[in-house]
Amino acid sequence: MVAGRSRARSPGSWLFPGLWLLAVGGPGSLLQAQEQPSCKKAFDLYFVLDKSGSVANNWIEIYNFVHQLTERFVSPEMRLSFIVFSSQATIILPLTGDRYKIGKGLEDLKAVKPVGETYIHEGLKLANEQIQNAGGLKASSIIIALTDGKLDGLVPSYAENEAKKSRSLGASVYCVGVLDFEQAQLERIADSKDQVFPVKGGFQALKGIINSILAQSCTEILELSPSSVCVGEKFQVVLTGRAVTSISHDGSVLCTFTANSTYTKSEKPVSIQPSSILCPAPVLNKDGETLEVSISYNDGKSAVSRSLTITATECTNGIAAIVAILVLLLLLGAALMWWFWPLCCKVVIKDPPPPPSAPMEEEEEDPLPNKKWPTVDASYYGGRGVGGIKRMEVRWGDKGSTEEGARLEKAKNAVVMVPEEEIPIPSRPPRPRPTHQAPQTKWYTPIKGRLDALWALIMKQYDRVSLMRPQEGDEGRCINFSRVPHQ
């Protein structure tokens, strides 16, 4: 019996496996799983495990390998199945997405007692039966078959036939060989030699190939470009993701386009790179038309990714924008020509400006009063005695008398009288202190100052050009340049 995908899960169904994982792996197991690479794609993953007598002493290593690899596939839509084979094959865990059942299946897998032969084809047969009953192409199917030792007799041939049937059902087959296996046998069972993972270091080295299996098997398409196209335009799409080349080994990759959920067309890719696929796309003829893009392999039997959507939009013609830009440039050129052409074509002749008038010199008033000069009785000058000369007093320094008195000869008995009192010099009153307060500096004051300086510079240059322009009534002539031969 095959269990289907669970649609509703109670909170308890998630709690038990979480506590079980914590108990098995320790407190750091959940944190370590978060730090390691994981796969978020939805898979139907089938583990086909060898439980023959040759692995009896190493079964716990096989169990740990399955347990750790299961933790890396973190999609809530992932479904798992555990199948063991020896002389016969047994389904330990039917295909299910119920996390509670998966936890219970891991416990049952741990309790398996290995014994018997290595009939790997029996395990592949049970996987194919579940794939047929799993619900078509809703999810990709992956088979990971693990065995040790050489396959004897007709077992390799039977296993190859079952693997071909798996691929016809849309599944990918990966093989893990431990110790004394034969590489060529597993390469014929797997999809390609790149999908065979040898573990020659023994069962303890199984955990070392988990990342390699994850990188090969987790094929995801994460991004589509372009997301919108112009109506009626031919284009190609680029789908980027990881592990893209792992599905292109047989050239069966197809790009499927579905227009408006009605018309479907498949195209082979133009090129396949390690992280991208380039596909030709059909033309969209209506505004708002949608195109769903998906990738599949095995001739469309195995879906790689969910559909990504492209939308058609009306695109304006770029010629109109170019014409508008050219018109604006022409208008700007005409305006510049109107402004600068008079400067190039006229020499303005103007009268020189009159010389500036000499500034009027103002006599400085002496705020200090004139000093009193001594008076001299000049009656003794010149006559050398009394008689014939009237008495005359000369005030030195008054109305030119200083120079006149300097020519006189002072008599022997001339009397010089000096006034005792002098007029005091008045002191200037102190200047009053300014009453206005300094303006407060705002946060934008430095910015405003720089902008004002820039604007002043622009206006200064504008005024310089404006002054050079001829005004009404100015006369001149065009400047003509001609080459004069050297004499």
UniProtKB/Swiss-Prot annotation:
Membrane topology term: Single-pass type I membrane protein
Which residues belong to any copy of the VWFA domain? 44-213
For this chain, one GO molecular function annotation is: metal ion binding
CDD domains, from UniProt?
Answer: vWA_ATR
Record-annotated disulphide pairs: C39-C218
Source species, domain of life: Eukaryota
The entry describes its oligomerization and partners as: Binds laminin, and possibly also collagen type IV.
Question: Can you say what this protein is called?
Answer: Anthrax toxin receptor 2
Which species is the source of this protein?
A: Mus musculus
